[in-house]
């Protein structure tokens, strides 16, 4: 009889321990649903605690793939594609009519004297990816050697130029913020090879005619940082100081026809939003 009592007492103890362990696991699982804390300090200027488990989770995307010289990469899944190698449906001529550059072999080629083209999309703060290539046969010199440009709002220009073993004024070479800042380094590949610009653009802000916040460029040329949060001084100008002129918070992206048959491919952008935005 004593043996039976001891056995049942042992079973009871195991059940009690098991229940306690299960409750602890349940409590831990409930705590981990938020993967964070609510008893930590609130971050300055915001409403979120440090390690706040109720803060919105970042959107999950497919990051895409890198380009090779032979094949353009795959854009991120949340990118807005401006040119996928098929047509110019996202572009227009300067007069608003159809863009008349040539599309061949998965790239668009400037038709010299056809005029610059602009996106139908109006774009604000963004990450822009664009690939370009100069003709393999080198012609011209200085600013006449494969000249084009990527102009945000048609006014803030990142220069496109064949700057491989070719000199020009520094704030006018490839990847320069034209007329303002030369690139930190010259990362230009040989003519005929594909070059890559990854550009982070922060739009200047105006209140009426007053500039309240300047614009900024961060630029990578072939994966190398050539501008690090560079403050814009205004519109890009030739032989004149940059100066600001008021404009809306969104505008077209322009690719410049400077009379040279520069090629472009794999053009896309991602809208840049504040933290915790859907």
Each language-model region and where it sits:
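Carbohydrate-interacting regions of secretory-pathway proteins
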Residues: 25-278
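Bacterial N-terminal signal peptides
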Residues: 11-23
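N-terminal secretory signal peptides that target proteins for export/translocation
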Residues: 1-7
